[in-house]
């Protein structure tokens, strides 16, 4: 049976890429597309929004009215909207691919609670390459982490509203966990003025916002006399969209639980 997917935030940059990815993938189809209430895009054809021509699927604003048209929601929007979508999924037995970043601790707790009743993949980044980088960072941290200064540099387009990026924070979490550190204690998110000497246990973050940068992340493991850099650069949002569709196919066989792309890609067995 073909898996039917719904895209929320269908008119956004990521939403349009997701529509394209769904249409190009095998075994799935676009069941519904949504925008926020009052959007000028309500009633527009989802295919035309994505540059694919008419698909006969009109952008809607009420998930409940369209709930019989899809099995899984893909959500790359903003925390306040995503929390409402999570409630909908729990109440209506729908599964969720969640790519929204910028959740506070309460939001993350709500996601975990919802996963006790439905199946959710929650990842800061759906790129296969980035998730491979997470594993490489763990390996590098084991070898060099206690003897080097660790810095994470990320760059994104001017429209991104949260900083550091969710991916950069995930990188920091993977490193901190490997080293037995707490990112809330050891993370350094800004430097200005007289900061004093750097602590060896610091995990530093630097953020760039400029033009149309899709997403770039570089992690330094810097020791005296040498530096190892692990980088990932995305040139198209399609890498994230294709990963999200891949995650949706994988999630179709799950009933409840909170998963990430490590589970989807079976990276724990590397």
From Swiss-Prot:
GO molecular function, one term: oxidoreductase activity, acting on CH or CH2 groups, NAD or NADP as acceptor
Binding site for (S)-2,3,4,5-tetrahydrodipicolinate: 157, 166-167
EC number per UniProt: 1.17.1.8
CDD domains reported in the protein's UniProt record: DHDPR_N
Top-level division of the source organism's lineage: Bacteria
Pathways per UniProt: Amino-acid biosynthesis; L-lysine biosynthesis via DAP pathway; (S)-tetrahydrodipicolinate from L-aspartate: step 4/4
Family assignment from sequence similarity: Belongs to the DapB family.
Job description of the protein: Catalyzes the conversion of 4-hydroxy-tetrahydrodipicolinate (HTPA) to tetrahydrodipicolinate.
NCBIfam families: dapB
Protein name: 4-hydroxy-tetrahydrodipicolinate reductase
Lineage summary: Bacteria, Pseudomonadati, Pseudomonadota, Gammaproteobacteria, Pasteurellales
